[in-house]
């Protein structure tokens, strides 16, 4: 989820710095008009997503009413977590079966029925499938990879707090996510058993209270929006009662994987403590559905300020067409494209990582071809705990 940054500048300039623009103009002049503008993702693929979850529910969960399907508790309690379960829904390859068997004891597999409804059941190469279904390549460790590449443990003064930057603190409130991303930076932490939340939280909040330099608290995990309304309100009340805390952010993927969680009561809670800033983890245009759009627009109506975080993933979203479609759709649901992250060197993630030069080329393919609001900042979270570096 979210890591606080040394730089918070959002580029809303439609152009490029003169030197970059000059080089880009030279490059563009060599292209025909037909190839100057990147081709948009086909509308048909986007339109096919609307209503998919309803068809999926009726096919695979015929006893589930519409009300049950739209209850986030039902979605969480019916998560698909085993090889036997996922085999009912997807035509698995031999490699996928082996991966599910061999990764079971290390990094859990979990996907909500809703999110599974967005995944192609037969195409192993489909983007969302790659992002959540284990790969046999996870079992191989490449040079430079580690379980804690950002050295968060080294900057954790008390359990649950990462205090890397002077005025910002990361508060890891839970190890639970409704859907586990296979490239997760905190795969070492998520999915396991933790100490009682009350003890964990009270010690963390006491640290924030006793550290006046902290003005910005990032609530993360796991996914904090999978907590109950009561726990979320308790956290927000405690944190916002600290006088030197000026800003509260929440890092989450819930609007994309569990949009049913954005209930009227949760919106009332968030509105009560506004402004709340939401860093929404978005991976691919296929996540922007009728359900996720409704959730995001409801959050915006409640006064929640939203920016996106996208991890650049080989074979998932590493094309100008895919990123442009994603960012245009995010803007339509009032999420500002904020960060595009180079994939962290987490153990077993080499198959997801592009080169930095490839990432820079993607940004060049966006800048100048679409509005500045649709161009995120490309950053590397430097290994060893050095913080974010814009590219």
Language model features with spans:
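Flexible, acidic/Gly-rich N-terminal and inter-domain linker regions that tether
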Residues: 2-163
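C-terminal accessory regions of radical SAM enzymes
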Residues: 361-391
């Amino acid at each position: 989820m979210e890591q606080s940054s040394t730089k918070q500048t959002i580029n809303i300039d439609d152009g490029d710095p003169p030197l970059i623009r000059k080089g880009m103009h030279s490059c563009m002049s060599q292209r025909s008009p037909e190839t100057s503008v990147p081709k948009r993702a086909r509308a048909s693929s986007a339109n096919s997503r609307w209503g998919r979850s309803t068809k999926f529910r009726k096919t695979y969960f015929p006893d589930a009413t519409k009300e049950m399907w739209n209850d986030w508790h039902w979605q969480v309690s019916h998560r698909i977590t085993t090889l036997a379960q996922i085999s009912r829904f997807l035509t698995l390859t031999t490699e996928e079966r082996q991966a599910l068997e061999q990764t079971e004891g290390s990094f859990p597999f979990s996907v909500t029925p809703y999110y599974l409804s967005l995944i192609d059941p037969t195409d192993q190469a489909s983007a969302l499938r790659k992002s959540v279904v284990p790969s046999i390549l996870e079992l191989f460790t490449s040079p430079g990879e580690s379980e804690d590449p950002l050295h968060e443990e080294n900057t954790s003064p008390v359990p649950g707090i990462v205090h890397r930057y002077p005025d910002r603190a990361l508060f890891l409130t839970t190890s639970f996510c409704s859907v586990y991303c296979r490239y997760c930076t905190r795969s070492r932490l998520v999915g396991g058993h933790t100490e009682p939340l009350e003890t964990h939280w009270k010690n963390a909040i006491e640290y924030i209270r006793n550290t006046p330099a902290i003005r910005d608290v990032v609530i993360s995990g796991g996914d904090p929006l999978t907590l109950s309304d009561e726990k979320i309100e308790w956290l927000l009340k405690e944190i916002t009662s600290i006088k030197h805390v000026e800003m509260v952010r929440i890092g989450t993927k819930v609007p994309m994987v569990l949009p049913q969680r954005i209930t009227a009561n949760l919106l009332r809670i968030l509105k009560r403590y506004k402004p709340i800033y939401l860093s929404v983890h978005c991976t691919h245009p296929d996540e922007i559905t009728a359900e996720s759009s409704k959730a995001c627009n409801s959050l915006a109506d409640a006064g929640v300020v939203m920016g996106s975080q996208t991890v650049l993933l080989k074979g998932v979203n590493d094309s100008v067409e895919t990123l442009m479609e994603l960012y245009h759709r995010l803007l339509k649901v009032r999420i500002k494209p904020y960060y595009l992250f180079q994939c962290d060197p987490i153990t077993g993630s080499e198959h997801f990582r592009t080169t930095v030069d490839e990432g820079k080329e993607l940004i060049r393919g966006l800048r100048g071809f679409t509005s500045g609001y649709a161009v995120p900042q490309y950053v590397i979270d430097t290994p060893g705990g050095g913080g974010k570096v814009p590219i």
